[in-house]
Amino acid sequence: MKIKEIKKVTLQPFTKWTGGKRQLLPVIRELIPKTYNRYFEPFVGGGALFFDLAPKDAVINDFNAELINCYQQIKDNPQELIEILKVHQEYNSKEYYLDLRSADRDERIDMMSEVQRAARILYMLRVNFNGLYRVNSKNQFNVPYGRYKNPKIVDEELISAISVYINNNQLEIKVGDFEKAIVDVRTGDFVYFDPPYIPLSETSAFTSYTHEGFSFADQVRLRDAFKRLSDTGAYVMLSNSSSALVEELYKDFNIHYVEATRTNGAKSSSRGKISEIIVTNYEK
């Protein structure tokens, strides 16, 4: 594939990811500071805003190691990743999916290379129920096979374009707790937090994007980090659910109410229009 062909590809998420921000991009764009220095996204997820902005100098992070490995392999081994995904596409079936899914139960996953692990996750997210990433308490992937007639498992042009973009810019890829991702934030930098949301009801479970979860204590710790970054002179933006708890946590900052469309969730009732909050430490 020629570089000039790659440049025509619009950068966008390479995988489905729960809580993705594609539907909210028009609103978020209106709230972004006009100019900023370095870009930080400590909960990058599928990277909808990251790819939309395509910053030249950025730090991206997530606490999901399997997801971050996908970013790393797209950067380092795009062609090998594409070839493995082509094999998954050729053999795609419910039986094939369930066999590959069980690799984290019978220790086969420990024998896989990093690029094989990335291809496994990307394949499963493309063909499973609603594109969910969900693991049980043993950190075993447990989402059933989806019912797609002709899923696009390999997007060769997009993977190649993302690889070129990451390699041609000053982009640092991290994995771990959000606080580790913001240690280098300085005055004039822009930080976007998109954490697992505070549930709107007692029956809403905290996310299982990783088997550790994200507690209310973590939400408070995040609010404290938001305040510290604000005090350093950084531009800070955060997304969360439209709830009284979020309003209370961020009462000292600017709160914007928006409507988002959710397209993936374990229950059909969790999809559709929902209210969200975007918090900024600056006026727009």
UniProtKB/Swiss-Prot annotation:
Q: Which residues form a coiled coil?
A: none
Q: Which Gene3D superfamilies match?
A: Adenine-specific Methyltransferase, Domain 2, Vaccinia Virus protein VP39
> Under the GO molecular function aspect, what terms does this record hold?
S-adenosyl-L-methionine binding; sequence-specific DNA binding; site-specific DNA-methyltransferase (adenine-specific) activity
Alphabetical keyword list: DNA-binding, Methyltransferase, Restriction system, S-adenosyl-L-methionine, Transferase
Question: Which positions are annotated as binding S-adenosyl-L-methionine?
Answer: 17, 21, 46, 62, 177-178, 194
Quick check: keyword Transferase in the entry? yes
Q: Name one GO biological process term.
A: DNA restriction-modification system
What Pfam families does this protein's entry cite? MethyltransfD12 (PF02086)
Q: What is its EC number?
A: 2.1.1.72
Reactions it catalyzes: a 2'-deoxyadenosine in DNA + S-adenosyl-L-methionine = an N(6)-methyl-2'-deoxyadenosine in DNA + S-adenosyl-L-homocysteine + H(+)
The EC class name is transferase
Tell whether DNA-binding is among the UniProt keywords.
Answer: yes
Entry-linked PROSITE patterns: N6_MTASE (PS00092)
Q: How does it assemble?
A: Monomer. Homodimer.
Reproduce the miscellaneous comment text.
The DpnII restriction system has two different methylases.
- UniProt similarity note: Belongs to the N(4)/N(6)-methyltransferase family.
What's the name of the protein?
A: Type II methyltransferase M1.DpnII
Q: Which organism is it from?
A: Streptococcus pneumoniae
* Taxonomic placement: Bacteria, Bacillati, Bacillota, Bacilli, Lactobacillales
Gene, per the UniProt record:
dpnM
